[in-house]
């Protein structure tokens, strides 16, 4: 029995989509357990590029069951747009390949409207939301006023809950200067969604449990990254769900003891999108060089990513919080060509060196990175297909990551394509 989770070990955008696609070859079931279509994964297979937001990366493989779990918030319009996009690229998306939890909460038009209005109202204190309605949907979920997929399957129940929500939300929308929403328009649109969605809807918790009990390999695909976790991230510049391994059990509907391995995905450097402290950020030519060579622009928003040196304090924190059993280091190819490479091994705060990630943003903003310097590797590594083919300086860099975090590197990424992947160890 093997059930393992793939998680972002930094601020997201670490290459989880590619690695999930790669590891999906060994899995029979691939599960999304949190987030929504605010996530963005890019996967390159042969000469085709696929951009995924909501559907698990395993959809690119035939004979894999892909699951959108109860912890995910689902925008039906975005879901069907993605299905149509994939089928246009020749990828079949049928109810035999994709199922959606009947307990998942629905993103409604008023969630998106409120997301935009509230972000605008924050002014210079905006939190960098993608304005996809994710946060307001999770708010309704925990406020117990949300509408779930199972509600959509019963038109009378859906109509009643929708009417109550629209009456309440329109008052808030009006207060924020927006235009009130129309019940009939939303009801009719979602009734059309209901008929198309119905064949995909199942009790996904049962399906996942049965797969694990049948000794099938189940891969849980995390979205965003550990530092965007609602509890352990750089709050309030975070997402609205639990992005750590702790979120798998509740977001997929299984016992925590069923997940046997946790694989953390980390870039060979660090990036983040939006506001918030970033101790190793490079606001210079080197940072610009990394951004351009690594094509560091968001899949969902197109926003440029802030770039900096690899921060081992972050990776050590992720290892502790998520119980990582191994690390995957991606984009080692991006650093090829730099004469010197630095790696953060601690923070100086108030005259003391610490090796943990402070909860307070004010404290984090005052942290000065303590660096170790490494010799770069001039050779391009995009064609390397084994660990032995990597430059010695790159191996030294990887060994230091293992030493500091106490976690083995199992896979190294040397490019965006599926075959640009080096398996260092079979064990995850």
Curated annotation (Swiss-Prot):
Q: Give the family, as the similarity comment puts it.
A: Belongs to the adenylosuccinate synthetase family.
Q: Which cofactor does it need?
A: Mg(2+)
- Pathway in which this enzyme or protein is active: Purine metabolism; AMP biosynthesis via de novo pathway; AMP from IMP: step 1/2
Question: Binding residues for GTP, per the UniProt record?
Answer: 12-18, 40-42, 305, 331-333, 413-415
Binding, IMP? 13-16, 38-41, 130, 144, 224, 239, 303
* Cofactor binding: number and manner: Binds 1 Mg(2+) ion per subunit.
Entry keyword GTP-binding: yes
Q: Which HAMAP family match?
A: Adenylosucc_synth
Q: Could you tell me what this protein is called?
A: Adenylosuccinate synthetase
* Active-site residues per Swiss-Prot or TrEMBL entry: 13, 41
| Tagged with keyword Nucleus | no
Q: Where in the cell is it found?
A: Cytoplasm
Q: What molecular function terms (GO) are annotated for this protein?
A: adenylosuccinate synthase activity; GTP binding; magnesium ion binding
The record, for Gene3D superfamilies, names: Adenylosuccinate Synthetase, subunit A, domain 1, Adenylosuccinate Synthetase, subunit A, domain 2, Adenylosuccinate Synthetase, subunit A, domain 3
Q: Write down the EC number.
A: 6.3.4.4
